[in-house]
Each structure stands twice: as structure tokens, then as C-alpha cells.
């Protein structure tokens, strides 16, 4: 029986959260449901846009507060790990850690995991597919540099199409 309690913070693109949850269940697939982790999910759809906060400074503190509130909820429920599904949300983590330093021990940093995996696979250069805010602020370039990974951004005129793909990928996939 799997006993770990995992917190998932979603709501930053509902379909990305749905896709992550589906993949998590597939990863733990077994003959018994008792082998799945105890999962607590918080989808705060009312949180302001992370992309607009990064690009225009709109509601930046509200985004930090919203992420912090979700993390606090997870910690109150005694989760052992917290996963933020949204890559762009990782940009705000330093500000979140100033408010909740103990969260750093529980957050599964998906960008660091990506860096470690890419380094193991000896990948020296990757194309970053992410929301405009993460691309403009060079979130992945900055974070993956320590792993020796060079990040290439798509052309700026493709950013809107990429955002649509990120937000609607599950819906689009069902059409084909």
C-alpha cells in the first residue's frame, strides 16, 4: 500500500492539471487502488494570470498570495510533497518561500527535475515550449543553465499559438 500523501496545486490551466493528474494515475497504475498515493488537489481558478503578472506586473502580489494560500492548505493537510503543475508558477516560488520558508522542503521543483533528467540524457540544447511570461522572463533559461542546458525560445509570433496549445491541449487532442 502506498502511504505517501501528495498535494497537487492546479487551476493554472485546468487541462494541464487534468493531464498531469491522468499521468500520475497511470504512473501508479496497479491492480489495487490502494497502491495509489493519497492525493489532495487544489484548483484555484480565481487566481490572477501568472503570465500577465510577469509581463505587466498586474496582480503580482495576488498571484504570490494565491500560490501561498494553496501551499498552506496542502501543508495543513500534512502532505509530504507538493507539486505545482504550472511551470510558470515556479517563477513566483522565491517570493512564496519568503512567506513560507518551510514550503521549500515540500515543493517538487519540476524545473530542477527537468534539468536533472536532461543532464542525465546528455541533452545540451532544448526548445522551450512555455507561456509567454516564462519565455519573456527567461525562467527556463536561467534555471536550466546550472545543468549546462541551453534553452532556445520559439519565435515570438508563435507565443499566442503556444499558449492556446498549453491551455487547450487535452481538448485539441480529442478531436484527432
Predicted regions and their residues:
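Non-catalytic structural scaffold of enzyme domains
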Residues: 1-176
